[in-house]
A protein has these predicted regions:
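N-terminal accessory segment detector
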Residues: 1-101, 115-180
Length: 180
């Protein structure tokens, strides 16, 4: 419904930014809840909460980080992703990943935890015809030019000059069928 109402790009940006904010909040909470454990034990609270909240299963493939040095590399395999399963139920297999909120969450979580902008990108996705979703995260600078499209989805629309006007949103909503 969000995609039909707002369009693919605006919906993606909205979901990604919502996920990012949720991730930053959960990272703050993980630091408090696991304050007496190792940094790695603190960090893995995020993927554990991902599962406990019913979002999907998150299996670490590789996780290396050093907060003091600002180094981070994370790679996770996601299965049974609710967000993705809903997407493929309503849209055909395509060329773009669709776990927008969860990638935003991973980026926000890692960024808050590391104190440095970390970008997770979905490099394989069920909505692209793969068997599972795979994400890779590292500092934005380490991605180079590859990061630009994904970073756009983390920025407020007004900063991109793409904020839809109220008239445009009203026009889109006017063509939707009324709920009975």
């Amino acid at each position: 419904e969000m995609i039909e109402t707002l369009g693919m790009d605006v919906a993606r940006r909205l979901f990604t930014r919502m996920g990012y904010q949720a991730g930053t909040y959960d990272a703050e909470m993980a630091r408090k809840v696991r304050s007496k454990t190792s940094l790695k034990d603190m960090f893995v609270v995020g993927p554990q909460m991902h599962c406990l909240e019913g979002i999907g299963l998150s299996e670490p493939i590789r996780l290396e980080f050093d907060v003091a040095k600002g180094e981070h590399y994370g790679e996770f395999l996601w299965t049974h992703q609710v967000e993705d399963e809903e997407h493929v139920r309503h849209f055909p297999i395509g060329t773009e990943p669709s776990c927008w909120m969860q990638v935003g969450y991973a980026s926000g979580y890692a960024t808050e935890f590391m104190g440095k902008q970390i970008l997770y990108r979905e490099v394989e996705c069920l909505s692209m015809g793969q068997e599972a979703c795979r994400i890779v995260g590292k500092p934005v600078d380490d991605w180079g030019d590859e990061a630009a499209p994904d970073l756009q989805h983390l920025m407020p629309p007004a900063l991109l000059g793409q904020a839809p006007s109220m008239a445009a949103l009203a026009a889109r909503a006017a063509v939707l069928p009324a709920e009975v």
